[in-house]
């Protein structure tokens, strides 16, 4: 996995990720990882934002808040990594993932 400061983001992505970090903190998430085409930087203009969410007891509330409170026309695809996740998906997140948020413990 990489950290978000390893990549040059657009101003729009920065605004989205800042809002996401605030929500992650508010909902008690331990870690948020971007994966998929945006993490690989192979995305198109309208590609969705794939997020792996770790350690969020209020995942459904968090997922709803992300959709409702983050101002973008892009769609989000959130995966609760504490639930049942295929080995292929877990490997993709580990291989391509970019850590956007990690709680301070």
Residue map of PLM features:
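Catalytic core of pol beta-like nucleotidyltransferases
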Residues: 1-31, 39-45, 54-105
């Amino acid at each position: 996995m990489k950290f978000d400061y390893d990549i040059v983001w657009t101003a729009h992505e920065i605004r989205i990720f800042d809002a996401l970090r605030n929500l992650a903190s508010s909902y008690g998430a331990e870690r948020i990882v971007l994966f998929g085409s945006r993490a690989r930087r192979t995305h198109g203009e309208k590609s969705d934002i794939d997020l792996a969410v770790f350690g969020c007891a209020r995942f459904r509330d968090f997922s709803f808040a992300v959709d409702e409170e983050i101002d973008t026309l892009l769609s989000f695809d959130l995966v609760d990594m504490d639930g049942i996740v295929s080995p292929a998906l877990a490997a993709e997140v580990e291989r391509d993932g970019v850590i956007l948020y990690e709680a301070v413990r």
